[in-house]
Amino acid sequence: ETGTEELTAQNIVLATGARARNLPGLEADGDRVWSYRHALVPPHMPKKLLVIGSGAIGIEFASFYNTLGAETTVVEVMDRVLPVEDAEISAFAKKQFVKQGMVIMEKATVKQLDRAKDKVTAHIESGGKVETREFDTVISAVGIVGNTEGLGLEALGVTIDRTHVVTDEYCRTGVEGLYAIGDIAGAPWLAHKASHEGVMVADLIAGKHAHPVKPESIAGCTYCHPQ
């Protein structure tokens, strides 16, 4: 079917999710350069893998494919892997990753990817020098961005902070009757946080008591080895 339909409601909940962030020159193509979505349904098993970014998404896929036998290199622009964790946790995790055969490059940046039919040449800057390394697969794990475009939110006066909708602890956007839940509402990008937000907003709309979202109370986990 085609055409436009206009709907009216007292309350509207935005739950459009998010997508992988693409950086210029590092865009995923689904062939040799993957986003997290491609890595979930891989077209081939990597033999020599480069993972750009060492947040939860990057480390989880690095750990997974390394366990399956891929020679895995992780490049992180910050001074330690898993930079949102405590420093001692990052240090312990890095030690274990190296023992497992991973190559960890911290304070390093992938400046350019040269793509060929069966390989990708990465230009990696580290310590003021640029070196080239070859891989058959690259996973770009440099964050996610909320799907805020094409919804007319700016015209309504909804505040957008870079890549997500700004909400209060009850997921209210500041526009009467308009809520935002899940990844479009920003970090932490966790399924159980989104589920709680959905239940909470449903309770609010139904006139029931609702427990607000408290970021400091949201448990998080990076599914790697060690976990």
List PLM regions with ranges.
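Glycine-rich nucleotide phosphate-binding loop and flanking beta-alpha elements
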Residues: R19-R21, G58, V81, V145-T148
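Short glycine-/small-residue-rich Rossmann-like dinucleotide-binding loops
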Residues: G17-A18, S126, I139, G143-I144
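FAD-site-proximal beta/loop scaffold in flavoenzymes
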Residues: D29-M45, T132-P212
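Glycine-rich dinucleotide-binding loop and its adjacent helix/turn
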Residues: T16-E71, V75, Q100-V103, E154-Y170, ...
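Core beta-strand elements of the Rossmann-like FAD/NAD(P) dinucleotide-binding domain
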Residues: T2-N11, G128-T137, G174
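Generic recognition of long tandem-repeat/solenoid scaffolds
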Residues: E1, T121-H123, V165-T167
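Generic beta-strand/beta-sheet core signal
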Residues: A15, V75, K107, S140-V142, ...
